Amino acid sequence: MKIALIGYGKMGRMIESVALSRGHEIVCIIDAQPIPCPSLNGKKIFTPDKGFASEAFRSADVAIEFSRPEAAERNIRAALAQGVPVVCGTTGWDVEGLKATLKPSNPQTLKPSTINEHPGVIWSSNYSVGVNILFAVNKYLAQLLQRAGGYTPSITEVHHVHKLDAPSGTAKTLAEDISPALFSKEGDNTRLNGECGGNVPITSIREGEVPGIHEVRWESEVDILTLRHEAKSRQGFALGAVLAAEWLRGKTGWHSMAEVMGLNI
């Protein structure tokens, strides 16, 4: 499979390594800071203004986007305009806003059979296989404890000092999955409210080079239930992104990591 990378920071480099180890080809890299790239035989990385229009980018089966919050939507739209599906892992931007308004940006680039559907997109706040299992278990546990009653949830997330957004997109996803089950009633449009995750408080900690720790705590008067995921490195996130790209190839429309893993509950 031919892969384009959008963003060539630590995650981009890890994704490159995993993709190559699985037999894929990196045909294009787009980054705001062009530097020599070993996987392209010494060629320089494209800047966004030239990269998306390049023959190299258009030859990709899928693009994997890990950039910055302010650039993510623009990058996705530019990729789709060239008919290239996108796996996006950038957090801290208005994903739902894009999802609600997304249309084929350039119908001439799409095959006739997909003229009314944009090229495939997967966005996830976390591509780790383990975290996506955590999402599924968290959602199910919230439903069980809603029936039991008497439990109060809270979330703690810990990341390295370089992470730009807080709380993490993963923590927000966990809170989003808890809130409807635990707090929403018929006729009540409960929504996330800023950084506290609606009715679910989130504590964000930034320290050292921690790849990522997420803990969901349910406390009652008599006991405590805890769900916890701790990443050992970025490799798990990179592998999940490549698995998502393999699954997305040839598909149209908006998809989720839960679909990739068959975890829809």
Which residues does each PLM region occupy?
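Structural detector of well-ordered beta-strand residues that form the stable sheet scaffold
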Residues: V27, F46, V87, G120-I122
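Rossmann-fold NAD(P) dinucleotide-binding segment
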Residues: A53-V62, F66-G89, V95
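C-terminal substrate-binding/catalytic lobe of Rossmann-fold NAD(P)-dependent oxidoreductases
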Residues: K2, K10-F57, G149-I265
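Rossmann-fold NAD(P)-binding glycine/threonine-rich loop
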Residues: E73-R77, G89-N106, I115-W123, N132-Q143
